């Protein structure tokens, strides 16, 4: 049976559960796919040229994580779906010798929320994940605000119709979303007292990091604010990516079931 290589490109990467859940799917569906897929964690140096690395490694598809999602958008031969709007790519697929970029973070995040009737969101951070979330939340009709320590990237969110801040706004929000990398460094993304104020009035504290109780989520727990880590988002976006890797042979709902069973 033909072997195809896939992977997740990032820095850092050792924390990623993507190889676990994708390899479970490749094993489960290999007969239907007609090939054996193997999915690797790939640590890229920060200065890497993503397309060159992808082709050099002989990959058929890959996920892209911190800090390469915006750079991945720039190197694709073709961009499809909501990735066109959000300027960030987390899924790369080789299709007819062209490198095609997708974004499954956006819908993956929304599916992970459930239908709770949220009206407003504060996104902390302005990177590729934040862009995808803002696009999807605006599409779903929420009022979206973005808080970042610098002006870097905020022009994108302004064009999208978000309220943008470099100092914490004195408002209440249903969703407070940590889309920064602070949790990977075991840090809070924002001043503790400011976060407490948001959590006390918010409906859900959401951290895109997963696999451990981050300082952000620990504070929410302390204040008895409902909280959620990025595990469900990971599985939803991964199952949507797997559908792309399988050329739509495996619907994301089937991939989701397998991934959920192993993580």
Curated annotation (Swiss-Prot):
Any Gene Ontology biological process: shikimate metabolic process
Pathway as given in its UniProt record: Metabolic intermediate biosynthesis; chorismate biosynthesis; chorismate from D-erythrose 4-phosphate and phosphoenolpyruvate: step 4/7
Catalytic residues (UniProt): 69 (proton acceptor)
Keyword NADP: yes
Family, per entry: Belongs to the shikimate dehydrogenase family.
Function: Involved in the biosynthesis of the chorismate, which leads to the biosynthesis of aromatic amino acids. Catalyzes the reversible NADPH linked reduction of 3-dehydroshikimate (DHSA) to yield shikimate (SA).
Assembly, per entry: Homodimer.
Protein name: Shikimate dehydrogenase (NADP(+))
Source species: Helicobacter pylori (strain HPAG1)
UniProt lineage: Bacteria, Pseudomonadati, Campylobacterota, Epsilonproteobacteria, Campylobacterales
Gene, per the UniProt record: aroE
């Amino acid at each position: 049976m033909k072997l195809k290589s896939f992977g997740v490109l990032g820095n850092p990467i050792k924390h990623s559960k993507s190889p676990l859940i994708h390899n479970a799917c490749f094993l489960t569906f290999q007969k239907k796919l007609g090939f054996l897929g193997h999915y690797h964690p790939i640590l890229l140096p920060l200065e890497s040229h993503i397309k060159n690395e992808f082709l050099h490694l002989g990959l058929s598809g890959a996920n892209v994580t911190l800090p390469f999602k915006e750079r991945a958008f720039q190197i694709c031969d073709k961009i499809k779906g909501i990735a066109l709007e959000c300027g960030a790519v987390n899924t790369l697929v080789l299709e007819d010798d062209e490198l095609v970029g997708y974004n499954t973070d956006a819908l993956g995040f929304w599916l992970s929320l459930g239908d709770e009737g949220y009206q407003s969101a504060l996104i902390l951070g302005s990177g590729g994940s934040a862009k995808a979330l803002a696009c999807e939340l605006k599409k779903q009709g929420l009022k979206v605000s973005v808080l970042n320590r610098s002006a870097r990237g905020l022009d994108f969110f302004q064009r999208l119709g978000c309220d943008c801040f470099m100092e914490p706004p004195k408002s209440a929000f249903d969703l407070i979303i940590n889309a920064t990398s602070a949790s990977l460094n075991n840090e809070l993304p924002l001043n503790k007292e400011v976060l407490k104020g948001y959590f006390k009035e918010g409906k859900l504290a959401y951290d895109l990091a997963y696999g451990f109780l981050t300082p952000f989520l620990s504070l929410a727990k302390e204040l008895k604010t409902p909280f959620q880590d990025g595990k469900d988002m990971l599985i939803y976006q991964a199952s949507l990516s797997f559908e792309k890797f399988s050329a739509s042979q495996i619907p994301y709902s089937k991939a989701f079931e397998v991934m959920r069973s192993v993580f």
